[in-house]
Amino acid sequence: MHIISLFAIYLVTLTITLNAEVWKPDKKPGLIPTSMFEVDPSLEVTVWATSPMLYNPTNMDIDHEGRFWVTEGVNYRGRNGTRPNGDRIVVLQDTDNDGKCDSSHTFVQEKGLIAPMGVAVFDNVVYLSQPPDLIAYTDVNRNLVFEPEIDKREVILTGFNAINHDHSLHSLTSGPDGKFYFNNGNCGAVFTDKSGKTFYMGGTYGGSGANWPADHLKNSGRESGDGHVWTSGFAVRMDPNGANAEIVSHGLRNSYEQILTSFGDMFQNP
């Protein structure tokens, strides 16, 4: 029998308590019975991890050792400020191989992390999608904890709308061509790649409840450095260092992530 392990995640709208480092609700969430899931008889649904190992996850990736790297969005939208020290990337592990998570710790927590929507792990480099930035954390000593005095933090690209909005910068993935791919919802962007080429990603979508560092409304219809006019949500292909960026799709509403086959065909929701 094949087993499907799921994160059991529950949005708890309760009065909260704060401590110096980690936000915690004052009550435990109720569990949803796995019997509620309808699957093929050859499959089984099991719970792999629950709160307090993680809270309100927004994205995840699995590294070559089977560890789960999860972004959290406790400070999402109207609850911004709930966790004063900022949101986190947490690392989850099953250390005794019994099919359940038994270890959870913080990789990085910063006040500037506000419901980041994407995480990708390549060896000891962790990429975080935190508008307006696409950030790379290099875990130099490979201890699974970001230490500013030892490790490296680099902004690969910047200029993506909107901060604390789910129509913004989403997760990065890799393709068989050695390129990196990522997408952004229809909040728009104005960003310059490491080759010096500027892209104006316009559109008509806007609203309150978020911070908009780029004026995508003003730049709607403006020609980008590649000679094209792009609009709305989009996907980008680039070198791992942020150079030679190309727009590979646009006109989307809010594509959350993309996946590429071994032949380079890309699939994404619109």
Give names to the regions the model predicted.
Residues 4-6, 25-26:
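Hydrophobic alpha-helical segments, principally membrane-spanning helices and signal/leader peptides
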Residues 5-15:
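Bacterial N-terminal signal peptides
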Residues 20-270:
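Beta-propeller domains with acidic blade repeats across secreted/periplasmic ectodomains
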